[in-house]
Amino acid sequence: MKKSDSSSSLVFSGIQIEINNNYGSGSGSNNNNNNNNNNNNINNNNNPNNNPNNNGPPLRPSSEWVLLSSSQPTIATTTNLTTNAPLSDSMIMNYVGNDNLNTPITPSTSSPYLKRNNSNLNSIIENSNNSSPSNAITRNNSFNMDPNNNNNNNNNNNNNNNNNNNNGEYMNSSIVFDNNVNNNNNNPNNNPNNNVHSNSHNTNNSITHSGSITSSNSNNNNSNNNNNNNSNNNNNINNSVNSVNSLMMNSDKNCNHQFPSDDVLISNEHDIIDLALNKEFLNQYRIQTNSIFINSQHVINQDVQSYQDYESLLSSYNTILNQLLLITSSNKNNNNNNNPNNNNNNVTSPNSLLSPPSTSQLQQQQQQQQQSPSPPLNNNNNNNNNNNNNNNNNNNNNNNNNNNNNNNNYYLMSTSTMSSTTTNLSTSTNSNINTNIPTNYNMSTSITATTTTTTATNTIAIGTTTTAAITTAATNSTNSNNLNLSSTNLGLDNNFLYQRILPEILSLLEKLTVFSRNNDTEIFNRLGNNVKLIFDHLNLIKNDILEANFSHLSGIFTIYNHTIISSDKTTKQFVFRFLHSLAPMTVPPAIVVTPELKKVVQKIHFSKPTFTPLCIEWKEICKYIDVLKSVSLFIAQVGQYCFLNQSIIINDELLFIPSIYVLFDNIQNLSMKEERFHIEYILHNLKFIVSKIPKQTREFTKTEIERLYSYIRGNPSYVKEILPKLLKNIYIDPYFYHLWNNHCIHLLNNNINNNNNNNTNNSSNNSNNNNNTNINIGKDIGNDLTLLLVSNKNSFLLSFDERHFSIFYSSISNSTTTTITPTITSPNNNSNRINNNNNNNNNNNNNNNNNNNINVNNNVNNNNVNNNNNNNNNNSNQYIVNYFDNTTSLLNFIESNQFKYIILSNKEVETIKFFKSVLPVTLPLPQPSSRQAILQQQQQQNYKPRILCGPCLSRFKTILDEFDNEESIENQIYSNYLNNINNNENIDPNLIDGNENKINGNDNNNNHDDDEKTNNNNNNNNNNNNNNNNNIYNNNNIEDYNNNNDNNYNFENEINDKENEFRELEKEINEIEKEEQELIKEYLELENRNQINLDIKQKLEDILKEIKLEEKTHYDLVNNYYQEYFDLKQEDEIYTNQINAIRDQLERVSQIDINKITFKIELPNTGVNGGIVGYNESSNTTISSINGFRLGTLSNLKVDWEEINSAWGETSLLLYVLASQLEFNFQNYKLIPMSSKSIIQSKNDKMSYTLYGGDNIQFSRSFLWFGASDQRFDSGMEAFLSCVNDIATFVQSKKPSINFNYRISKDKIGDSNRLLSIKIAGNSELNWTMALRFMLSNLKKILDNLDSIVESKQKQQQLQRQQSLNNL
């Protein structure tokens, strides 16, 4: 059979993403589902040519896990489950079946994984999808060569059990993971005395409100078998449920050890079995652990009191969720009662659902189920069984269908999840569509209980579990014994019940707030803060109740993928871990089968609050420089890219994701502007952030940029809601990141015009209406694609395989044609196949021929059946399969509007192989900074290992031993299988021919009659023929043996000779063995010597390493010494040069006479006899100066009094400095130099005299004429001259060698020839000026000899001191 690839998809709240993946192998047709031990039935579906799994050995047998503990009773084959969630028709045992290690996690679950049932090998429940051989003990001591022969039906006299399509277009079974609900075995052909459970692959099944599964094609058995199976189912179902609940509610907490957050999914997990199971997941999730989490993650050590408080809060939380779920389920149950075909006499009130049923009520219900056989609760073959003689019993049973177990659903509710919906879908009901489909109500964000006065909508669980939700007409039943609630009253009652729970929610919110404030602890697991999750979830529920909006959608996550049912355990582990890494703990994934697609596709649903924190371990992110906060835009002309002229640095790792949300929230308004460059700016921001994620993230392609442009232009909310979530997943989730980098995730060009949810059509009240009303959303798209294409406006599509889209669609029926073939794509050769498993239209074929491959002839027959069904007013959907190589062709077909319903499905794939090829062994981590390295080192130092108590250690060891034993058994089974294959290759061809003849004879006898009795007779005849053939074959073997004995007698002598030779050879062999033993001893001695030599060599090498290390240390010390020496020497030279430079400067400064520089006196030239050269008034040199100020005036050269006064101030300052340095005190006067206003004060009478004059002073022009003068000024000059005379006398006393040129007498000064007065009165300008010059000359004489005078004075003082000492 050709392997064909198909697609599965994943829709993530606002994000649709496509993922490419290679199919490892097509899903083989599981045709060999019935292995009748009594040989009364020959399975004609054993076609090795159509089964690719027969071409080679099976996969390695995987461990089989059951949810029941060893002390619980075994679950028998069941056909009816009292469950609150929809079950797949062919998967009843996966919660208790093998390969299923991924139980949905709820806070009340004792373990996130499943326990192993080791009590009885015969009770191991086998999965129909398990491709490994089963244990011989569980297979009635017969080794099954075909890995697909998983069902052993004893005493099965019916050949119409394997009505399975052999196309391989879809999986024949599906797995149901729906919180506390186990799967169901839908084949009622099992013997109740047989403990081996079989999973039939009947696809024409339906799902009822009670969660039971009925098989329409398997009801052709005798009544005894049916009754036994039904009673057996009713006896064992409650045991299964009680076992599940007891295991989930009672967890063994042997000690207070803690698990790292990346190992478990529940914070309060203490079951030691999880630690043992951890080795199963260690290798698979090391990649994710290395990418997101670090080994130094905090280990929370909580005290008992805080933990008890947390568990009490969690218990209250679960109680509220249970009550909400009961109210929601009451809506669903009352909708069942409103069904006109429902003859249920039970009266269920919404108020009665607030408490679980009592034990007596459960026992009564079980006894009622055991007293009468449980017929199929919902059979879709009311009018389609006219052409088959074997369906008479089935028609009789259809008249008594009821939902007796409907009221038993509510004690199997989910304790942690609740439903939320996207849209309300409605179509009119018909006889072929089960209108009583229960939905999986999982608590995630809000309550779904939307009802109207005319319709009671079965809303969709976990963000709409069914994409083709059928709206049932809310009409009053005609049965007088039923108490039905109208939809209006039901909505009001539920609203009242929701309001009653509101105070409990508010109270728990207050307790959660107090708990988070009072306890400085963090109850973290790998999915986030549980307390925070509960708080956010309850707030969402509270808001929904207050707003009376019970169908509000806060988030949806849907996976359309069949890899979950692969027998490859690692694939399922990967998929579930991938889901759990994205989902909160309180909203685990649940697998649900929709009513329209229950035989074709399965969907995994769980919803997620919008603002729920996901993975906690954040890594340091780069500095992001692009935030729009009141910043103007600068538009570049090249490339239409926009840049900011202001930036904000975000370097806090905890603010990266929030800052992205803030950024896109701020720039959302730009997308609503008409200019193109605004959207270009948004795209530039997106590309910039992706390029800065520290994982070398790939850039967007041109096609993706164009699609993003169209998305943003079409829907402005796309910027705020979708893009941040895409970046968040790339940044947080390692799988998402690597799939993105390897071009497995890219944008889907979804050009379908999406409308709001208000386009939902109400279904008709007439349940017999044959015209279905599809939901008009843009194009005419069926309900099965509604969730995929409408749940989120412009979104990404994530599919694990995109190589080929396998699409099933129902054509538009009209009066002329029944099938419209699309012209956009060219389908493969398999496109003309018809899905015979839908709508139960396989009744025209013989019992045995229904299991054959469908061909073109079957297509014609089935078309006839569809026409007949239309005449009988039965709406039978005909599904045609096409293959599309790319997404564009699929979307073109969708837009062509050539179908009524469309179904996306895919086959079993080995996804994990592709992921292993994509993901490296260890993901690269960004290099931590020095600060991060220090923090990580400190965290590692603070890390405390887990300490287990004695019971835990012993239990842990016991479980590991069990694992090892079972693994060895599985290895033995697998090796036996390989040995059997090798033995089969050596079988005598004659025996093979005989077996083929026997099988061919049986096949010929099974193809004659259509009547059931005739088939049974033929089967018996075939068995007799087989026995006869076996007897003849045995007789021939006896004759051949006698002939061989005659010949063997002649060769006895030769045999004796050979025996003698054999003995001699044995002796030689013994001798050789002795020699071999000696050689082995020698070899061992040499090995010992060699080992000793190696030890010596190793010691010498160690010594050599130590010597080299010491030598290296020595040379390092020497190098350091010389390095320090040369550094010090260089510093010494630098300091020496600095000292020399300072000394030179000091010498130059010391040679400078500060007094001469400060007081610069200029005198006119003098003659030989002391006279003045050019003694006339015209000579400018007559006037002396000090520091540039002239002291005196002439008749022909007038000097301003300001300059004269300044000169007098400098002169008084000079005299004051000389007296200070000579330590001389004037006897009569005190100098007060004040620049141009200097004065001199008498010490006797304290009179002050000025040393400055003014313009009022006039000199005498002749001897007889006196001028005007200032008496104080003249007295001051006379006093000043007296001071000069005193200091000159003091200098001569100290140093007699100094001779002054001019002598002073009272107010006159002069040489030996002439004395000139220093007063102005009666004096001329020339004489006054000359007198001042003489005075400055004497002062200059003292100034020039000041140093020698001081030195002479010091010497005299020393002599005096010496004399005084001598005198003493």
UniProtKB/Swiss-Prot annotation:
Disulfide bond residue pairs: none
One Gene Ontology term of the molecular function aspect: protein-macromolecule adaptor activity
Keywords: Autophagy, Coiled coil, Endosome, Membrane, Protein transport, Transport
Polar residues bias: start-end ranges: 136-147, 168-177
Topology term for the membrane: Peripheral membrane protein
Compositionally biased intervals (Low complexity): 24-57, 122-135, 148-167, 179-246, 992-1005, 1015-1048
Chief location category: membrane
GO cellular component: endosome membrane; phagophore assembly site; phosphatidylinositol 3-kinase complex, class III, type I; phosphatidylinositol 3-kinase complex, class III, type II
Region (Disordered) residue spans: 24-64, 122-249, 331-431, 819-874, 992-1048
Top-level division of the source organism's lineage: Eukaryota
InterPro entries: Atg6/Beclin, Atg6/Beclin_C_sf, Atg6_BARA
Coiled coil region boundaries: 1047-1150
GO biological process: autophagosome assembly; cellular response to nitrogen starvation; late endosome to vacuole transport; macroautophagy; mitophagy; protein transport; response to yeast; sorocarp development
Protein localization: Endosome membrane
Pfam families assigned: APG6
Disruption phenotype: Impaired survival when exposed to pathogenic bacteria S.typhimurium associated with the accumulation of S.typhimuriumin in large vacuoles which fail to undergo autophagy.
Gene3D superfamilies registered for this protein in UniProt: Autophagy protein 6/Beclin 1
PANTHER family, alphabetized: BECLIN 1, BECLIN-1-LIKE PROTEIN A
Job of this protein: Involved in autophagy. May be required to recruit the atg8-phosphatidylinositol conjugate and the atg12-atg5 conjugate to the pre-autophagosomal structure. Required for normal survival when exposed to pathogenic bacteria S.typhimurium by promoting autophagic degradation of intracellular S.typhimurium.
Family assignment from sequence similarity: Belongs to the beclin family.
Protein name: Beclin-1-like protein A
Native species: Dictyostelium discoideum
Protein's gene: atg6A
